[in-house]
Amino acid sequence: MAASSLNLLLILSLLTFISLQRSESLSDNPSLTLLPDGFDWPISHSDEFDIIDGEESFEVTEEDDGVTDRRSLYWRRTKYYISYGALSANRVPCPPRSGRSYYTHNCFRARGPVHPYSRGCSSITRCRR
């Protein structure tokens, strides 16, 4: 019994030694490149192609480290679905020109416009309300 456990221990140590040697030899091969944990991609969406003096800047400063956690929620994929009730024929989701959003829950019971127009005159609106 002692001889069989000694043989088992010897075989396990030999297999461990061979696997360690094999994993080290893979990293020496110049055709294989090991990727780091994170890619150096731009963190923010708005300034990902900022060009300063002809060079693209993709550097993240220490000040931005607290912001990256907040912005990471932006990069998650979300799926939006339209309900079968909204797709049904001959159904107007909300009265036209009511100022209510199509996404307002039960917009026929809601009173008053959601976002009333309160901007002043400009050359675009030509003071029309």
Curated annotation (Swiss-Prot):
Q: Which UniProt keywords apply?
A: Disulfide bond, Hormone, Secreted, Signal
Per the annotation, which location comes first and is thus the protein's main one?
Answer: secreted
What are the boundaries of the signal sequence? 1-23
On induction, the UniProt comment says: Accumulates during senescence.
| Superkingdom as given in the UniProt entry | Eukaryota
Enumerate the subcellular locations listed in this protein's record, separating them with semicolons.
Secreted
Q: Where is this site: Required for proteolytic cleavage?
A: R70, R71
Kindly state the tissue distribution recorded for this protein.
Answer: Expressed in roots, stems and leaves.
Q: How is it modified after translation?
A: Proteolytically cleaved, probably by S1P, a subtilisin-like serine protease (subtilase).
Which cysteines are cross-linked by disulfides?
C94-C107, C121-C127
Q: Which GO terms describe its cellular component?
A: apoplast
Q: Name one GO molecular function term.
A: hormone activity
User: Tell me, what is an example of a GO biological process annotation in this record?
Assistant: cell-cell signaling
Mark which residues the record calls propeptide.
24-76
PANTHER family in the record, alphabetically? PROTEIN RALF-LIKE 34, RAPID ALKALINIZATION FACTOR-LIKE
Family of this protein: Belongs to the plant rapid alkalinization factor (RALF) family.
Query: What role does this protein play?
Result: Cell signaling peptide that may regulate plant stress, growth, and development. Mediates a rapid alkalinization of extracellular space by mediating a transient increase in the cytoplasmic Ca(2+) concentration leading to a calcium-dependent signaling events through a cell surface receptor and a concomitant activation of some intracellular mitogen-activated protein kinases.
The name this protein goes by in its record: Protein RALF-like 34
Q: What is the lineage of its organism?
A: Eukaryota, Viridiplantae, Streptophyta, Embryophyta, Tracheophyta
> Gene name?
RALFL34
